[in-house]
Amino acid sequence: MKEFKFNDEQLSTIQELEVDIDLKKLEIAISKESIDELSEDELLALLKVTNALYRSGFPVIEDILYDSFWNKFALNHPNHPFITSVETEVLNLGKTVALPQKMLSTDKAYSKEEIKKWLDRILKAAEELDIDTNEIEIRITPKLDGYAAFDDGERLYTRGDGVKGQDVSRAFERGLKVVRNSERGLGAGEIVINKAYFEKKLSQYFENSRNIQAAIIAEKNVDERVLEAIKEGACVFHPFAVLPNWTGNYQDLMTDFDGIIEQVWNSVEYDVDGVILEATDTRIKEHMGANRKFHRWQIAFKINDEVAEVEVISVTPQTSRTGRVTPVAELVPTRISGAMISRVTVHHYNMVKINGVGPGAIVQIVRSGLVIPKIEKVIKPVDPQMPELCPSCKSHLLWESDHLVCPNKSDCPAQTENTLVHFFKTLANNDGFGPKNIEKLANLGVKHIHQMYDLKPHQFAMYGFGEKTSKNLYDQLQASKNIEIEDWRFLSAFGVSRLGGGNCEKLLQHYSLRELFEATVEDIAELNGFARVSAEAIVKGLANIKEEFFKVYDLGFNLSITPKQSELESLASPLTGKIVVFTGKMLQGKRSDMEKHAKALGAKVGTSVTSNTTYLIAGLKVGETKINDAKEKGVKVLSEQEYLDLIS
Ligand SMILES: NC(=O)c1ccc[n+]([C@@H]2O[C@H](COP(=O)([O-])OP(=O)(O)OC[C@H]3O[C@@H](n4cnc5c(N)ncnc54)[C@H](O)[C@@H]3O)[C@@H](O)[C@H]2O)c1
Ligand SMILES: [Zn+2]
């Protein structure tokens, strides 16, 4: 257990609060992360103290702990002013003014279950209002961790206690801009600082970005580095109204909850401490309303960064598909953010060597909510043990920059097995060839992709699969050949370094599969998007797989060929870049389908004729005036048949 003590700076912040309390008791409670020994008054003092420290940029406990203490106090004192109003800022600039609009805090959730409960309340409100629940739109935005303020177009206010704030318009006078030069007057938002800019230019001088935000609105003389940050647009006022966002209904959200949260979470370059979910329908908002602290139609989803110090039991080398040997630290099993963690990868063996990761080392592990845990730092290093032989084939390992590598490309079981797994996973058009079954087959001697395709149902059975499974595996293999797949996907399934799907597609826009294997480093380096080092790696990688590749290719996969760049260019249609408008009833089919087709041919489809329109395509029953109008504007009028002739 760490013993916590307030430092001088914190003590001076606390002094201004004028709480009458034995600070020693608070220090013990913070150390123990427990309030069991505090009276109600002491608990309130603890909340006030931690809040003030948090607001001045030096939080001393985790948000989740603060929130649990807050909840305990709220339980016994639901009507206490500390509970019913928003936690106040500690900045005091003197006079307060009424805010143009109430600024509330947000309700908080730390788990998907809590979010589901909140969504259920939204859906219930929809039902009470007789609104189709599928139509209820949820909007999710990143929760900016800056300094809350409200811009009414004339003045900028701090949130204050949510009802009265302070006029800090001087921030704009100091050159602060609204993000992306948006207009003023977009309401609530936060003053935020670009993370990368802070790291690069400000972190040597300021402990955290909150200090800077406070300086902009509070101080008489703002540091010139901060003024520079404002001038360069790295420090802005970001209204919530113009945040990147995800919208969709309940079902959309539930199909990919983790993915959506992660995507929104990472959508801005500012500090974020959660995401905000809200119902957008004004009827729902009115119906659900707010209490004195938060809107019931809005909630913050936060994730707790959990840290643990864990002992390493051993470091296991694992050979990957490419031959790189990855060190995996086996840990004394420890619960972090709700999951039992017993292993974590160390990036490469150079890290093991430099940082001293080995049996008996103590490492600090961090897990941010949904994310895979990682080693943050090594607290107690030991002498690391470096493997000399490949754990799979016992070849002597070689160093390649930071990595230990098994040089046995053709016959290392770990490499061949992982290559098979990668192949079937990339094809993604068949079932049955996951890691488990592949391991079973590989152990029994199936080393190469082409060997897999040689297997007959009775052979699967010989390898210990049941009769039905054997037949199914055989059928799946045939299907994977017969179902059409793109040639670039097929090539990328061989797992050559630097030949992921994107690069394969780019290359196959210039070369056929057969030609590509003949291409030289110079040929590839000449193409847009390929540096010389990549070209070298690609040529080498292709040479390594050439024999196996053609054994598999010759099995007759149903490949769709990537269109060649030259063809794409000569294919430019007569509609490329033209603006067309359709009017009247078409004989050939629905007008909407024709519009889609025109778009696919590169045209822009307009809804009304302007002088920029290239063609007006007139179907049946089009009035004479419309046609004459178009002609007057210099627009070429085509009948449906003339149009079809043009594009055929
Ligand atoms: N660790 C600590 O010691 C400590 C102390 C006090 C408070 N806290 C934390 O602060 C919370 C209370 O602070 P708070 O009232 O400022 O609430 P908050 O900061 O958690 O969230 C509410 C605020 O989020 C802002 N916000 C940011 N992005 C937004 C968006 N996209 N849409 C809408 N609003 C957005 C708004 O200004 C709103 O007022 C506590 O629940 C706790 O988690 C921690
Ligand atoms: Zn090996």
From Swiss-Prot:
**Any one Gene Ontology biological process term?**
DNA replication
**UniProt-annotated catalytic positions:** 143 (n6-amp-lysine intermediate)
Which positions does UniProt annotate for Zn(2+) binding? 390, 393, 406, 412
Pfam families linked to this entry: BRCT, DNA_ligase_aden, DNA_ligase_OB
Q: Which UniProt keywords apply?
A: DNA damage, DNA repair, DNA replication, Ligase, Magnesium, Manganese, Metal-binding, NAD, Zinc
| Cofactor(s), by name | Mg(2+); Mn(2+)
Q: Which residues bind NAD(+)?
A: 63-67, 105-106, 159, 190, 302
Q: What is its EC number?
A: 6.5.1.2
Task: Name one molecular function that GO assigns to this entry.
Answer: DNA ligase (NAD+) activity
Q: Where is the BRCT domain?
A: 570-648
The record lists the catalysed reaction(s) as: NAD(+) + (deoxyribonucleotide)n-3'-hydroxyl + 5'-phospho-(deoxyribonucleotide)m = (deoxyribonucleotide)n+m + AMP + beta-nicotinamide D-nucleotide
Q: Which PROSITE patterns match?
A: BRCT
As for family, the record states: Belongs to the NAD-dependent DNA ligase family. LigA subfamily.
Report the function annotation for this chain. Answer: DNA ligase that catalyzes the formation of phosphodiester linkages between 5'-phosphoryl and 3'-hydroxyl groups in double-stranded DNA using NAD as a coenzyme and as the energy source for the reaction. It is essential for DNA replication and repair of damaged DNA.
Protein name from the UniProt record? DNA ligase
Q: Which organism is it from?
A: Shewanella baltica (strain OS155 / ATCC BAA-1091)
